[in-house]
Amino acid sequence: MPDQEKLFVRRVGEGKPVLVLSGLGMQSWLWLPFLFASRKKYEFIIPDWRGFGGSKDCAIPEMDAISSHWNDVNTLIKQLKLDQFILIGYSMGATTAMHGFKHGGLAQKLKAYLHIDQTPKIPVDDSWQYGLLGQKHPLFKSLLLDIQNVLSANRQATQFEDLATSARDQLVKAWGGFLELQSSNSYSPKLFKAALNCPFLQKYLMPIQRLDYLLWYVENYLNHDEDYREAISQVNCPTTFFIGRSSTLYPETGQTIIAQSLSNAKAVYFERSGHTPLITQPRKFSQEIGKFLENQSQ
């Protein structure tokens, strides 16, 4: 990578290149069940983001997470000499793709694009009501500020276990509040309370065990003010949107508006899913990825 760190990149299959950009907290191997059926026609190139999987020990750059991810992806594209390739972006991976559309001319290099459950603008304001958590966005930012305050006051701690008991409780309580905010599962509050009262379970609620990386990602979502609406609307290659009909993180209405702003796009709705259709509707998710790829070979 540009800072001489080595990013882990999983490469599976043979054939035309498909670059796959994961969501926050995912590891590259999680994609394998959904891509397995297409492995004879396509080579899937799946980087692990810094802080996760095979890239968990990469140094944290000075820049924000999305800019850093785009730099890493752009470097990978150049190293592998990718051109007219298929791109799949899910959640934070889709944000990284849109960053490339706006700042790196990425759209001109694509044969097709699959955009999975992400908004083109994280903040909510008068011009865009469909950012992260919609009308609950102010509460979301308040919870992230609580997390930031705990982590900033304990920069000497590198792992969750390094925190004092009171700091651990504050961190888990704030993170649990965020999870409850986005959850439609009636069992979730009980699970959060159980974890809060059981130190052994607390760390398993956290998406990242390295606290310096957690702070980096939290500050990214607190400060990210990019607006990618115009950039993604200019994408001309065949584009498919996977949209969770019940997505609380990124309201379906906003995603539909963006899908309709493209000249060559269609939307696939996951009726029983929110932000994680690969978990709630894995069979449909796998089938629709297969259809998307098959359409590009015709």
PLM features: residue spans?
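Active-site loop/oxyanion-hole signature of alpha/beta-hydrolase fold enzymes
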Residues: 36, 46-88, 92, 101-107, ...
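Structural signature of beta-strand start/N-cap positions in the alpha/beta core
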Residues: 17, 43, 84-86, 111-112, ...
